[in-house]
Amino acid sequence: MNKMTPEEIETALKPIADWQLSEADGATAIERVFRFDDFVQAIAFVNKVAERAETAGHHPDIHIHYNRVRLVLSTHDAGGVTSKDLEMAAAL
């Protein structure tokens, strides 16, 4: 799986709402913050993300802050963002 350039990522993100280019552990990543009414809804969302990630065999970094969940996607083996990350972002 080939690592994408920042320009390729920006173009690919245009149809995927609210995801943005970022950096995680020195590698290019994409991330999005999801907001919920309360902690219970946030955790229910995290559980759905976990199921989807297990099915896909591709796991985001998940940061939980009460009613906010920040997901960060990057393909660690490739050292940056690949099509796997964009597919997961679009599915969420």
Curated annotation (Swiss-Prot):
Q: Which InterPro entries match?
A: PCD_sf, Pterin_deHydtase
User: Which positions are tagged coiled coil?
Assistant: none
- Which keywords annotate this record? Lyase
Assigned EC number:
4.2.1.96
**Gene Ontology biological process terms in this record:** tetrahydrobiopterin biosynthetic process
Q: Which CDD domains match?
A: PCD_DCoH
Q: What class of enzyme is it?
A: lyase
* Single GO MF annotation: 4-alpha-hydroxytetrahydrobiopterin dehydratase activity
Q: According to its UniProt record, which protein family does this protein belong to?
A: Belongs to the pterin-4-alpha-carbinolamine dehydratase family.
Instruction: Kindly give the HAMAP family that the UniProt entry links to this protein.
Output: Pterin_4_alpha (MF_00434)
Q: Which PANTHER family match?
A: PTERIN-4-ALPHA-CARBINOLAMINE DEHYDRATASE
Task: Specify the protein name.
Answer: Putative pterin-4-alpha-carbinolamine dehydratase 2
